[in-house]
């Protein structure tokens, strides 16, 4: 897919450069979504969606990898520069001794970028190239040691606005089972320097599955909040079932949902990274509450949830799939290994907390206020920080 030429046309570069770009986009529009994810996002028929999810389960498509390559000029190291501005103000840089990099997460869908390469030899540089990133809405953050990490932004709300990119990120654990960081140095640089994380919410249960984490792996200057919970119907105070597996809400889980939203109402915590272990069930439940509160449709919330199926986490479907169709009970899994009840959770939310408006957004707001003691002013603060205004479009 090509866009208006901006590279050679904009710069009219006739100078001689010692570094020659092998990857030259010349204003092209590039897609940072894998083809498997892009195809899934475009599907609307439920039978086709069910078949596609089965075929692509654990396909490892939860990544954003864009190659940038060049011919070296004898330099021993190179710096690759990216910026949204022609003069490279506020640039992001990558250092390498190779003649190619795979960008891991700096690009935001819908924006135009400029890039160039410089070397450590005197006068070593390339021409400036440019490209535009196709609107996704999915923005994966690709890590060397992590998976299923993505920006919560990019989804359109039912009143026509968009959830901002770069505010909240979701994913899996950042520490290993021994309690230390399982991230590479480059992963930490992405979180600290490129994404600028200032708050971390840990949804895991202390002493049970959290690897004894007590502070942010991103550094002591990052605000860390433990909010232990279980996902899906466990967030409802009256949830209790006897079979097939006895399950029951604990008051701590509901209180933790409240803690999450108290944390999100404080702008000093942004950008925020929230996670459980796999970034699937507990994380998926909180992502549903956040974007649902902001006004994202149930259809898009469901697609965002099911994107985990393309990662090594696998099988996170709106309901079980039998004979090529989603079952009607809204439960994908209910056994000793896991409990996945996406559509059943939404059904119970609407049954218990629906308001006169009949909207999912208002039902979530009602749940947060009545069950979790989140205030109306906190909800408005979150919306203000997370929703795009007219002058930001």
PLM features: residue spans?
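Ser/Thr-glycine-rich phosphate-binding loops at phosphate-binding pockets of nucleotides
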Residues: 278-283
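Cys-dependent protein tyrosine phosphatase-like superfamily
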Residues: 11-273, 286-393
């Amino acid at each position: 897919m090509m866009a208006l030429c901006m590279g050679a046309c904009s710069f009219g570069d006739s100078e001689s450069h010692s570094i020659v770009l092998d990857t030259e986009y010349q204003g092209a529009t590039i897609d940072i979504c894998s083809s498997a994810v892009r195809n899934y996002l475009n599907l609307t028929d439920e039978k086709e969606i069910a078949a596609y999810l089965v075929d692509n389960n654990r396909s490892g498509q939860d990544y954003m990898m864009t190659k940038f390559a060049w011919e070296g000029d004898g330099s021993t190291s190179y710096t690759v520069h990216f910026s949204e501005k022609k003069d490279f103000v506020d640039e992001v840089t990558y250092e390498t001794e190779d003649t190619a990099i795979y960008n891991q997460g700096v690009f935001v869908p819908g924006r135009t970028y400029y890039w160039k390469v410089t070397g450590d030899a005197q006068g070593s540089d390339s021409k400036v190239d440019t490209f535009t990133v196709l609107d996704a809405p999915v923005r994966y953050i690709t890590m060397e040691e992590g998976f299923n990490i993505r920006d919560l932004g990019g989804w359109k709300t039912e009143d026509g606005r968009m959830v901002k990119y770069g505010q909240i990120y979701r994913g899996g654990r950042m520490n290993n089972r021994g309690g230390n960081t399982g991230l590479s140095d480059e992963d930490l640089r992405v979180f600290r320097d490129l994404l600028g994380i200032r708050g971390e919410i840990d949804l895991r249960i202390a002493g049970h599955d959290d690897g004894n984490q007590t502070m942010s792996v991103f550094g002591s200057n990052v605000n860390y909040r433990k909010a232990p919970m279980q996902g899906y119907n466990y967030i409802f105070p009256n949830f209790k079932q006897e079979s097939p597996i006895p399950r029951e809400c604990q008051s701590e889980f509901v209180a933790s949902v409240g803690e999450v939203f108290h944390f999100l109402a404080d702008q000093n915590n942004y950008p925020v990274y929230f996670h459980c272990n796999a970034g699937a069930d507990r994380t998926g439940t909180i992502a549903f509450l956040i974007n649902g509160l902001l006004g994202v449709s149930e259809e898009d919330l469901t697609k965002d949830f099911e994107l985990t199926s393309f990662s090594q986490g696998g099988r996170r479907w709106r309901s079980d799939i039998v004979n090529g169709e989603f079952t009607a009970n809204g439960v994908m899994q209910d056994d000793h290994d896991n409990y996945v009840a996406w559509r059943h959770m939404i059904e119970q939310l609407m049954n218990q907390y629906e308001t006169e408006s009949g909207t999912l957004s208002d039902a979530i707001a009602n749940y947060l206020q009545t069950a979790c003691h989140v205030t109306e002013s906190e909800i408005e603060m979150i919306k203000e920080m997370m929703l795009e205004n007219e002058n930001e479009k």
